[in-house]
Regions:
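Core of compact, soluble alpha-helical bundle domains
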Residues: 1-150
Length: 150
């Protein structure tokens, strides 16, 4: 145990969202997801317009983001809401396609017990981004596809 760990009370340590989730699985999730995004007629133009062929840095950032979300590493320091608000023109169908594709990859990468935890985090994030980009404070996010990835 490091000196820093000794100073943190056990009940205050941040635990992973699920004990079976590993950094390797998160890397695989991000790699597979964005590999399929690049083949998706709806999602690829949205991402490519911002990434402009520089997928390496984007994938590294997304891996850090998902490690922060699922493993509680705290390494991601970005601000995803303003980034997504600047995109403009996102439609409900874009979010539905994103969640549907994400669910498919989660089903391939994670253990069955971990899948609902990962999907719930993704849906919570998608709802937050949708609310920020919709501009409608009283609106409800679209219904996410429920029959995929679980």
């Amino acid at each position: 145990m490091s000196e820093r760990e000794l100073r943190v009370a056990p009940h205050l340590r941040r635990l992973p969202a699920h004990p079976s989730i590993t950094p390797g699985q998160i890397s695989e999730l991000v790699e597979r997801f964005f590999g399929r995004v690049r083949d998706d007629h709806r999602l690829d133009p949205i991402f490519e317009a911002r990434v402009r062929g520089e997928w390496g840095p984007h994938l590294a950032k997304m891996k850090g983001f998902w490690r922060s979300v699922l493993l509680k590493t705290g390494e991601y320091k970005g601000r995803p809401v303003p980034v997504h608000v600047r995109i403009g023109g996102l439609e409900n169908e874009d979010y539905i396609a994103w969640i549907g594709l994400f669910r498919d990859i989660v089903a391939e990468v994670f253990e069955p017990d971990a899948r609902p935890v990962v999907i719930e985090a993704a849906e919570r994030i998608a709802a937050s981004l949708w609310l920020a980009t919709s501009g409608e404070l009283t609106a409800k996010p679209p219904a996410w596809p429920q029959d995929r990835g679980r």
